[in-house]
Amino acid sequence: MTTENSLPPLKIKDKTAKICIIQGGMGVGVSLSPLASAVAKEGGIGIVSSAALDRLVTKRTGKAHNTYEAALEEISLAKANGGIAGINIMVALGRDYEDSVKGAIDAGADVIISGGGLPLGLPGVKKPGDTALIPIVSSARALEIICKKWERLGYRPDAVVLEGPLAGGHLGFRFEELGLESNRLENLFPLIKEVSLHHGGFPVIV
């Protein structure tokens, strides 16, 4: 039941968030399990940032954690109080990327959100099982490239996050492109939605 001024629930894969809000992955050390767990408990989607997670968990626990172990532990804590929780993993993390993905999936992460580059190989790292895979894009061209690559791996995005030039983080825009009318969210959205519909009709999150 929704009122005129409320957002409908957000359904991704087999999960439904009663509050249509995804708390962003803010690194380093902001989006950790306490924040993600609190958001998930209230009905939104809580997100842990994987940036420097091994060092942060090692410092907090006093026990050495590698990248895989840190993702496994932090996601487990984020999910401990119920609700929907996942992780944001940047492609730019390089060698830590795949270990973060594996740890998150093994911990039962509800979602993996991935940007900071094109996550072309994400579905091939490990069978996601119940974990929803969600790329971050800033253009229809980027999403089309991801969809075609993922389909060759036997997968389609479960949703996509569209970030415009005013978003924080690692954006796909050059400085001179930031003020272009064509890059306003309201102009990017229809193009992204068209690609989504062409590849199965997954949700577009702005």
Go through the PLM ranges and name each one.
Residues 203-206:
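Glycine-rich beta-strand-to-loop/alpha-helix junction loops that act as flexible
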Residues 2-200:
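Active-site entrance/lid segments in N-terminal catalytic domains of soluble metabolic enzymes
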